[in-house]
């Protein structure tokens, strides 16, 4: 992220977050279609809900709660969510070797790193200093399991993809709330 106006930094971060959230949703759907029998999907989704460690972060759970937090807090939460996936995503491409959506999985890590840098640039602008994000939580998700012949591995990966999708949705929401708060525009209704 080169030096640019704050409005551009926010616009770029929101676009990156939206793109990553869409990739995560597409990846989740493709994995589900390929590996999870239709009759099992709903019950598995309910069981997976409790396994996202990001639920332990005292972060807002929706747009209304996010609007009650400061921009710096929302940036910190977003950064923690993004950083918790950097490790696991390095293994994503090994799991999905012959798949169309997953053909982009090598780039997902780079896109996540770009978003991390964008959030850090926003934090520097808003905090007038270097980011201190590690103070909230320095936990990360397990890596994806490459053994797709094991039911346990399939369920683990399905749960991880579900958490990845949820976490990117949160980060996207936080960034959009901040952008709308600072730069009122027609695209603020979401």
Swiss-Prot record:
Zn(2+) binds at residues 19, 172. CDD domains: somatotropin_like. The keyword Zinc applies. Transmembrane segments: none annotated. GO terms for cellular component: extracellular space. It holds the Pfam family Hormone_1. GO terms for biological process: animal organ development; growth hormone receptor signaling pathway; positive regulation of growth; positive regulation of receptor signaling pathway via JAK-STAT; response to nutrient levels. The keyword Heme does not apply. GO terms for molecular function: growth factor activity; growth hormone receptor binding; hormone activity; metal ion binding. The modification Phosphoserine is found at residue 105. Keywords: Disulfide bond, Hormone, Metal-binding, Phosphoprotein, Secreted, Zinc. It is found in: Secreted. Disulfide bonds join 52-163, 180-188. InterPro entries: 4_helix_cytokine-like_core, Somatotropin, Somatotropin/Prolactin, Somatotropin_CS. PANTHER family: SOMATOTROPIN (PTHR11417:SF2), SOMATOTROPIN,PROLACTIN (PTHR11417). Plays an important role in growth control. Its major role in stimulating body growth is to stimulate the liver and other tissues to secrete IGF1. It stimulates both the differentiation and proliferation of myoblasts. It also stimulates amino acid uptake and protein synthesis in muscle and other tissues. Belongs to the somatotropin/prolactin family. This is Somatotropin. It comes from Vulpes vulpes (Red fox). The gene is GH1.
